[in-house]
A protein has these predicted regions:
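N-terminal soluble domains immediately following signal/targeting peptides that reside
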Residues: 70, 96-100
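Short S/T/G/P-rich N-terminal loop/turn motif that feeds into the first structured element of a domain
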Residues: 1-74, 78-91, 104-124
Length: 124
């Protein structure tokens, strides 16, 4: 399903080796919390939730280059409208047990956070 006009939240987190396991733990908790709390229909609907994980490479343009030891986590959530993102953040602060742990973990990693962006182009 194409998502043009919907709203995307994207986080890219580069975790040093000593913090990668905490990322795994946080995202397991996050997925369970998302599944239990998020809307599936209407203007607040969560349309997709994807987390990917890969070793960081010394040369990102060369898939055969040596790993740095860091781990890259990429989180993408797509919502029907901005209202879904607003609801997400309100719920996270109020009900997710690991919200503070995630914020603390971000401080230990190299993070790029895009909390709310309109999707311009989308296929299928």
């Amino acid at each position: 399903m194409a998502h043009e006009g919907c709203t995307q939240l994207t986080y890219i987190i580069i975790a040093p080796p000593e913090h990668a396991d905490e990322g795994d733990r946080i995202f397991r908790s996050h997925r369970a919390w998302m599944r239990a709390t998020h809307h599936r229909d209407g203007e607040k609907a969560l349309l997709s939730y994807d987390l990917s994980k890969v070793p960081e490479l010394s040369n990102q343009l060369d898939p055969n280059s040596e790993p740095t030891g860091n781990t890259i986590f990429v989180l993408s959530e797509v919502y029907q409208t901005y209202a879904g993102v607003d609801d997400h953040f309100e719920q996270a602060a109020a009900t997710w047990a690991d919200f503070d742990a995630m914020i603390s973990w971000f401080d230990k990693c190299d993070t790029t956070l895009v909390p709310s962006a309109r999707i311009l182009y989308s296929l299928w």
